[in-house]
Regions:
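Acidic, aromatic-enriched beta-alpha/helix-loop junctions
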Residues: 30-78
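Short, charged/polar N-terminal "headpieces" of proteins
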Residues: 1-19
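Generic low-complexity segments that are intrinsically disordered, proline-rich and/or Lys/Arg-biased
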Residues: 25, 53-56, 95
Length: 108
């Protein structure tokens, strides 16, 4: 497994799937000397029938809880590209096509 630099800290991904819709659930893990802290960078957006509104090879980036500098850095590193935006409630989420081959190199 490889690591990438995020704000001066060694970081990697955890990849899983959301139970409803089976879309990628992407978590960034940040290494430190005690414990690896992590946070999800994706959100599972569903329509009224609980069907995913994001394409299978994409995520809705969680701009409510993840800073713009993280979004910019991960995009700069080529882990995804923004292909659209989607509205949910009061928020517009970037829809990002994942470079899963590259992400898996940096994932456990």
């Amino acid at each position: 497994m490889k690591y990438f630099d995020l704000d001066g800290k060694k970081s990697y991904f955890n990849i899983s799937k959301y139970v409803i819709g089976w879309r990628p659930a992407l978590m960034v893990r940040v290494c430190d000397n005690v414990v690896d802290d992590g946070y999800f960078i994706s959100v599972n957006l569903l329509d009224n029938a609980e069907k995913p509104i994001i394409p299978e090879d994409c995520i809705a980036f969680d701009v409510n809880n993840v800073g713009p500098e993280v979004y910019a850095r991960l995009r700069q590193l080529g882990f995804f590209e923004e292909v659209d935006t989607v509205n949910s409630g009061f928020c517009f989420y970037p829809v990002c096509k994942l470079n899963l081959k590259k992400i898996k190199e940096y994932a456990v």
